[in-house]
Amino acid sequence: MLEIIEIKQYRKLKDITLNFVKGINIISGSNGTCKSSLLYIISNSFQKITKNSLKNKESVSVISNINKLMNPKIESLTRGDEKYNDPAPNVKGELYKCKYFDNDMKLDFRRHNSGKENKEKKRFSIRPKYKKGNNEKIPAMPVIYLGLFRLFSYGEFLNDKEIKKITKKLPKEYLDIIAKIYKDFTNIEILLDEENDYNGMNMGEIKKRGNFSTTYDGIDSNTISAGEDNLYIILTALVSLRYYFEEENRSSILLIDELDATLHPSYQIRLYKLMKEYSKNYEIQIFFTSHSLSLIEYALEDKEDKKDSKVFYFLENPNVRLMEEISINKIE
């Protein structure tokens, strides 16, 4: 798990130190304050788990098949840039440094340019620099990243040829857990019997989602609302990492960009409570961005296990800085 990030410079993030908790880390701030960029940095600071290091060699394969992005690197998350965008102009060497909870190791991460000198083709990656003579390596841990692609509506996806079933799935006991939690939230009962072919759905390069029928006529995975679809995707990620922990007894990380998008405020609070429970019981370190003042206020006033959650609020003037002694009155 990630304990500290010291950012020298990455885009607008400059000379910032972030001390995280093992539980829930909420990242908020006005538009353009590099909240999503911070999620990219976190994901970039871990490598994929290899099958050879696992008790159940299929555990990571299963969760990577049903979740859209696992352990994405900065170069893949920024590949949509139309031209080369230097993340730290005129800065040489270290861009940021990470310290991890599980050991005293600190890793420096630096820019590596690749491609042609033509700026239309040039790209960058950010990789650790290992000290000579030390047995250092970037920690391996499953990182599920839920970006805004998860909000794309099935009804607006016009290329049926790209839609494919996902044959690998969680064991039935975990599908039952997802279904139970989903019903608790929505009062919609998912059918998981053998007559209903319960497989995930891969919508091309867009997203992976559930594919199911329900006990209500006319309501299934293709007709539920955007918020209900978003909720299902988030629950799938949480239960996937629970499955991983119960199989391997190892920690994991969940990153969610704009958790509150499409979700009713009551869902946001209930999801926050569920994430606190899952984070504590199944060693899932959670980071999410949010613009929801009601959710932020609830988290700030949450007195139960205060050390298990933390709010970061970014201000811009002109570089991003952290609000000190954060309160909802200061934010409003």
Model-derived regions: residue spans:
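RecA-like P-loop NTPase motor core
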Residues: I296-E332
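Conserved hydrophobic alpha-helix in the ABC-type ATPase nucleotide-binding domain
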Residues: I234, L271-Y272
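Walker B catalytic acidic pair
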Residues: D257-L259
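H-loop/switch region of ABC-family ATPase nucleotide-binding domains
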Residues: T289-H291
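P-loop NTPase switch/coupling surface
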Residues: M1-Y154, K165, K169-L170
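Extended helical coiled-coil dimerization/tether regions that scaffold
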Residues: Y145-D229, T236-F245, N249
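Phosphate-binding P-loop
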Residues: I16-K22, F245-N249, K280
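Loop/turn-to-beta-strand initiation segments
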Residues: R250-S252, E283-F287
